[in-house]
Amino acid sequence: MAALAPLPPLPAQFKSIQHHLRTAQEHDKRDPVVAYYCRLYAMQTGMKIDSKTPECRKFLSKLMDQLEALKKQLGDNEAVTQEIVGCAHLENYALKMFLYADNEDRAGRFHKNMIKSFYTASLLIDVITVFGELTDENVKHRKYARWKATYIHNCLKNGETPQAGPVGIEEENDVEENEDVGATSLPTQPPQPSSSSAYDPSNLAPGSYSGIQIPPGAHAPANTPAEVPHSTGVTSNAVQPSPQTVPAAPAVDPDLYTASQGDIRLTPEDFARAQKYCKYAGSALQYEDVGTAVQNLQKALRLLTTGRE
């Protein structure tokens, strides 16, 4: 992909989107579709924050130029031209990153790469809002990922051992970005998610994350590659994990076959949702994620045969 024209300095008003823009830069070569939507999210959010002051107008204008250049380079890529495909692509990518970090966490393997994966997953779920309202599941994943990144980062910084696993996932408090995260001392017991402790990569030493790559599939759940496949033309020397046995597909609910098609009336919205689930399934199969593909196909089948989800 051709290099994009650089952006001017980020106005202070746009501080809340700086990490989304950084994520875009990190994915320019790794996954241009993800990079495109990260910039689109930053553009839309920036417009809502301030589109009138000269420095903000100039920044947004240059960001728009980047978006137009990216869209031209991506051409007829369905993930950009079709929102359903684009949403599925982003959701699957964010989920792979979340599952990689969650698997490392549950196994007690705490490191900077895992912290960044948690935090980046939360940023990508922010980006999914360009397609509309988030699902309840995505909202929970975002809150949990951002809090886990905060908690583990603070523990490691303070020389403490984090508690593995889903601690405090049921808490209602939202996690917001806080520049003072590094100054917060932790109690003996793991804290619950709160607005006073949020992970901010900028608080780490310069270069802490430079060049970090998630090992493809390393320590990730079966059929859940940590790094979404992409074609770069560069051969990786990383050791690949041994082939994993594909788990048996979940049994399909017999009720789906007994529903009478003639007894239900589907709306255009029902057909659109069914199509969305099929697109999600197709995207999951690109990553050999059988479980997610089957789950989405079952959702589509249930909707089409019962008229409900």
From Swiss-Prot:
Signal peptide: none annotated. Residues 2-75 are annotated as: Interaction with CHMP5. GO terms for biological process: late endosome to vacuole transport via multivesicular body sorting pathway; protein transport. Residues 2-186 are annotated as: Interaction with IST1. Widely expressed. Expressed in brain, liver, kidney, spleen, lung and heart (at protein level). Residues 173-254 are annotated as: Disordered. InterPro entries: Vta1-like, Vta1/CALS_N, Vta1/CALS_N_sf, Vta1_C. The keyword Transport applies. Involved in the endosomal multivesicular bodies (MVB) pathway. MVBs contain intraluminal vesicles (ILVs) that are generated by invagination and scission from the limiting membrane of the endosome and mostly are delivered to lysosomes enabling degradation of membrane proteins, such as stimulated growth factor receptors, lysosomal enzymes and lipids. Thought to be a cofactor of VPS4A/B, which catalyzes disassembles membrane-associated ESCRT-III assemblies. Involved in the sorting and down-regulation of EGFR. Belongs to the VTA1 family. Interacts with VPS4B. Interacts with CHMP1B. Interacts with CHMP2A; the interaction probably involves the open conformation of (polymerized) CHMP2A. Interacts with CHMP3. Interacts with CHMP5; the interaction involves soluble CHMP5. Interacts with IST1. This is Vacuolar protein sorting-associated protein VTA1 homolog. The gene is Vta1.
